[in-house]
Amino acid sequence: MKQIYFLLVVLISFNLKAQSKKIKIIDSISFEPVPFATIFFSNNNGIISDEDGLFELIPEQYSKKDSLFVSSMGFEPKQFSLDIFNDSIIRLVPKTISLKNVVVTNNQLSSNEIIDSVKLYIDKNYNFNITENKLFFRQEFNQELEKFKLNKFKSTIKDLTAESMDRMTDNLPKKSKNELESLSYYYVNSNIDAPKIKLIKSRRTNDDNESDLSKSLGDKLEKSLRENLKSNSYFKIRSGWLPFSGDLTFNGLWEIDSTNQDQLNKLKEEEVKRKENFSIGQKGRIQSVYLKSFFNPNSELNFILKSKNYIFSDSELTYLGNELVYVIECYPKRGDKYKGTIYVNSDDFAVVRIDYENIKPLSKFKLLGVSFSSNLEKGRMVFSKFENEKYSLSYYQNSRGNNISIKRPFKIIEKNKFVKGRKKQNQISAKLDFASSSIYNTELQVFRVRSIEETQFEEIDEKNQVLPIYLEEFKKDFWEGF
């Protein structure tokens, strides 16, 4: 399996027909990144840089004949011809005089009139057909370890002593980051609450920020478990009066006998299940993005459909790319958790962009030494015209912050039914004192939308055979050819 994986990586790295690359947008004076800048092409496709000013230029988005336009509030816009564009950094020049962008019109509408018009034209403006969406979905998880202590540690496994565990926990990386990206066809059917997905390709990238000592201790722990635990054991976990039980399985801890057909069949079944679970997970996460759309009655971004719950600022007219738009600030009157800024096309009253941010904690939980809080969520949704002059979701970006802490005793008890004597084999006990904070970033880009018939939707086979390829570092040619 390792040889096959290595061969795949080699083949990918030598395929040099058209490379994707990461580009950073910075302030030409301060050299600070320019977050959430607008990047669009002459073919009307567009993306937005992330909070670090980064975006990925993927061949699927453009042709060599296209031009690249970059703009951000407070900076002079820039334009490039893609057939000669080879830079990895774009420098935007700050505007020398920052004046309020005011457009004079003889048809000045109030914010409430604009919101009412948005409601009136929702069915006309947005694509509610059954659609096939070719999209790129990226998830980034950043975690900072604030505390990890195992107090009163006891173990019957000879190599797992309190001293060795202290060394291991002291050398855990304080910060970690991993990314998961996938390209897929995602099928939306508004008539049923069951989308479909066909995965094309996926990759996972982790930061290699662990120290050599931490790695060696990890190897020592694995070696100790392999030598002291039996592969046919099971375990029970107890935390106070809360018991749990399950099969003792550690992926890769015990070698598979290539001559044992039962083990090989079990391995194949686990592989099929992993692929199925991965596709189900990706489909559910993408579905949660689409359900966030403002025209979904159950969305928390209900600035339009539940406009009575919000206070709206006076509208301002400005340009978003080449479009003249109304900009309206939204602030909740009572219990709603989000404030927002909506951008409404002045011609057809379609919402083309929504920026949102929470103003209240999203959730809190504290019970029996376990506490969890979700205290941050901010993001952006962009809607663009694809086929039939209808708007569909084209871009989504979201950041969510969580805090978790655990202060609880626990026991892990190894038991085995296949040995003579008592079932209990080993026991580990300790009092866990753990705290961490995390930021979960999500980004979705839609490259193409096309309507399909009901019969085509029903015939879609969801037998996905894709698992993410693990890479230790970012490779710019991974998405080549896709």
Describe each region flagged by the PLM.
Residues K21, S28-N43:
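Short, ordered, surface-exposed loop/turn motifs in non-cytosolic proteins
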Residues A37-F40, L68, V104:
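Hydrophobic beta-strand segments
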Residues E56-K64:
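Short Pro-Gly-centered beta-turn/loop motif in secreted/extracellular proteins
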Residues F69-F80:
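A short, solvent-exposed loop/turn motif at the edges and junctions
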Residues R91-P297, F303-S307, G321, S374-F482:
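Surface-exposed, low-complexity/disordered segments
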Residues K21-D27, G53-F55, I90, V102:
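A short, amphipathic beta-strand motif
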Residues M1-K24, I39, L99:
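Bacterial Sec-dependent N-terminal signal peptides
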Residues N45-F55:
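Short, acidic Ser/Thr/Gly-rich low-complexity loop/linker segments typical of extracellular
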